[in-house]
């Protein structure tokens, strides 16, 4: 990843200019199939959820607070928060206006498997990064990474990686674990992936071009 000044929205060799300032739903869809590494551990993103400032389910809906401050920061930076006081959740700040983010819900683990298994315990590969809490534990993501740029270490985000699954076939449906806007189909995932955290019953199927 090339170095990026803190004063500008980040870009990388795998993420074109303007990628992070588009509508959050487009970004959430396009992140599916990309490779995310944290200190060399990670894999292919197979599930995401989009949230924006006008979304009643979003942390930013009621405005800026100490907890959600990173959501109002620069696009292409991390927003990490603790869910239910138990586990960390990793989001990427994005969107055309402040207050948007995409939650990374699940990965197909491919790199640094031994280190991730040590963090998570001796479990089967399918459950290593299936769900936002498990994902953060496996990758070693904590609130110490909140606000960091995705353009520099420990993060590395790269273009699509072949997993042997139908990565171009993406499903969209309602998000998981929320109490507002529960019917909004802003969850995106690889339709055939066994590493997806929630139900694979979709509202509709789209491809990488959004068709």
Curated annotation (Swiss-Prot):
NCBIfam families tied to this protein: 3mg, PRK00802.1-3
Family to which this protein belongs: Belongs to the DNA glycosylase MPG family.
Top-level division of the source organism's lineage: Bacteria
InterPro entries for the chain: Formyl_transferase-like_C_sf (IPR011034), MPG (IPR003180), MPG_sf (IPR036995)
The keyword Phosphoprotein appears for this protein: no
Record key words, sorted: DNA damage, DNA repair, Hydrolase
EC number, UniProt record: 3.2.2.-
Top enzyme category: hydrolase
Keyword DNA repair attributed: yes
Name of the protein in question: Putative 3-methyladenine DNA glycosylase
GO molecular function: alkylbase DNA N-glycosylase activity; DNA binding
Classification via Pfam families: Pur_DNA_glyco
Gene Ontology BP annotations: base-excision repair
């Amino acid at each position: 990843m090339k170095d990026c000044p803190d004063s500008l929205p980040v870009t990388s060799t795998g993420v074109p200019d303007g990628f992070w300032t588009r509508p959050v739903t487009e970004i959430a869809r396009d992140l599916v199939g990309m490779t995310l590494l944290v200190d060399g551990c990670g894999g292919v993103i197979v599930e995401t959820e989009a949230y924006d400032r006008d979304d009643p389910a979003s942390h930013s809906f009621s405005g800026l607070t100490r907890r959600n401050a990173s959501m109002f920061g620069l696009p292409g930076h991390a927003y990490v928060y603790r869910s239910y006081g138990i586990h960390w959740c990793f989001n990427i700040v994005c969107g055309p206006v402040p207050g948007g983010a995409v939650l990374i819900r699940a990965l197909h683990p491919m790199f640094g498997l031994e280190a991730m298994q040590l963090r998570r315990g001796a479990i089967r590969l399918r459950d290593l990064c299936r769900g936002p809490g498990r994902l953060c534990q496996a990758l070693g993501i904590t609130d110490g990474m909140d606000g960091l740029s995705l353009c520099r270490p420990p993060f590395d985000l790269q273009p699509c990686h072949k997993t042997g699954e139908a990565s171009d076939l993406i499903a969209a449906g309602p998000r998981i674990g929320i109490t507002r806007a529960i019917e909004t189909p802003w969850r995106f995932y690889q339709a055939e992936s066994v590493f997806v955290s929630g139900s694979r019953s979709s509202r509709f199927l789209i491809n990488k071009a959004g068709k």
